[in-house]
Design a protein with these regions (language model features):
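Catalytic cores of the polymerase beta-like nucleotidyltransferase superfamily
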Residues: 1-399
Length: 399
């Protein structure tokens, strides 16, 4: 079996081979090639040390991205190629990282340390696939299975428990029975892993098309990673998630959390340790999830949330059963109409400003309060977005 590798990947492997080093495409890119999917990136494993890799690619830009683990990044032909020395990991003392890394000349040793069989295959454009752990067979069976003993693999790095869930969600695969049983048994080891690492895997798992069956089967694993998540909100969260397309991590996380209630919602979001923008967007969606907005509030909601967030809210409310399909379509149509009307979605867009109000005799907080009132009236269609009309209204109010 052969694949059309990108030219920079082929060139890198050829240059390494010409210097007497073994080199293979490895891991997720091989898995994706076998599935007929174009890989997002290509990793290369090699028999030479990082220092020898530097020599091979003298004249190219080489970045020491993880040299202590044998990894350098070579910029070649417009691609960033991670090139990593074959290695064997030492003992994992903290359930997260190997205490030591030993470079080796053996591809077999390198593949043996990897997490799952579907990620433990290598490919050379001349000699073909190297598959020591039946990864291709598991791909055909649509199965996530640990390399070797699942107890050892999952004890080494507890994050692999969530990685298995994420791969099952991403690939729409099942998880091998022995691997699954070990995941359930070792779930409490997730406390050894940083919140940032667990959150990244959970968010990616939630965003994928196979999230509902994967998360549903391993709810105990999710609760171990998110101890503040109230179990009573779990079923409605999965149900809402099942009605949404894959891809939008913000919307799909909001669907999963929308019934949590306070303070569990805030605590769970805080525990994810994500960006402030992500937390605030999910929080806003969850808090509005059960409150459909009235027709004359469309522009107000658009000004408050923005177009992307308001469209998300409508989709979330439909997924949660608050709106039916017809009601959802009507609200999306209102959003389009409000955008086409070119309404002032911020105070800056009004045809009057604070100086105008000050010139009319307003002062202090009254200026801001009045601008806000004008903005709300314009958005609700109760006052034209016209300078003369607004000045006339203000004049009447002063009498």
């Amino acid at each position: 079996m052969s694949f059309d590798l990108p030219v920079p990947v082929l060139l890198a492997i050829m240059r390494l081979n010409e210097r007497g080093h073994e080199a293979y495409a490895v891991g997720g890119c091989v898995r994706d090639l076998l599935r007929g999917v174009t890989p997002n990136d290509y990793d290369i494993c090699v028999s030479c040390t990082p220092q020898e890799t530097h020599v091979v690619f003298a004249g190219e830009r080489v970045i020491d991205t993880g040299i202590q683990h044998g990894t350098v990044t070579v910029l070649l032909g417009g691609m960033a190629l991670e090139i990593t020395t074959f290695r064997a990991d030492g003992e994992y003392l903290d359930g997260r990282h190997p205490a030591s890394v030993r470079f080796t000349r053996s591809l077999r040793e390198d593949l043996r340390r990897r997490d799952f069989t579907v990620n433990a295959m290598a490919y050379h454009p001349v000699t073909g696939i190297v598959d020591l752990y039946e990864g291709e067979k598991d791909l055909k069976k649509r199965l996530i299975r640990c390399v070797g003993d699942p107890e050892q693999r999952l004890t080494e790095d507890a994050l692999r428990i969530l990685r298995a869930v994420r791969f099952a969600s991403q690939l729409n695969f099942d998880i091998d029975g022995d691997t699954a049983r070990t995941m359930h048994r070792l779930r409490d080891r997730l406390h050894l892993v940083s919140r940032e690492r667990t959150a990244a895997e959970l968010i990616r798992a939630t965003a994928e098309s196979g999230a509902v069956p994967a998360l549903g089967e391993f709810s105990d694993v999710v609760f171990a990673a998110l101890p503040d998540f109230p179990p009573l909100a779990w079923i409605s969260g999965l149900k809402a998630l099942s009605h949404l397309p894959a891809g939008d991590a913000t919307l799909r996380m909001a669907a999963l959390l929308h019934d949590c209630g306070e303070p569990a919602l805030q605590n769970t979001l805080d525990s994810l340790r994500q960006s402030r923008a992500f937390r605030e967007e999910v929080l806003a969606l969850c808090r509005q999830a059960r409150q459909p907005f009235a027709p004359d509030e469309t522009a107000v909601m658009l000004a408050m949330l923005g177009e992307v967030q308001l469209r998300r809210l409508v989709r979330l409310q439909q997924a949660a059963g608050v709106l039916d399909e017809k009601e959802s379509a009507q609200r999306l149509a209102r959003i389009r109409a409000a955008l086409a009307a070119d309404l002032p979605l911020s105070l800056r867009d009004l045809p009057v400003n604070g100086k105008d109000l000050t010139a009319m005799g307003l002062a202090g907080e009254e200026v801001g309060d009045t601008l806000h009132t004008i903005h709300q009236m314009v958005l609700r269609g109760r006052l034209p977005c016209d300078r003369a009309a607004i000045i006339a209204w203000l004049t009447r109010q002063k009498k």
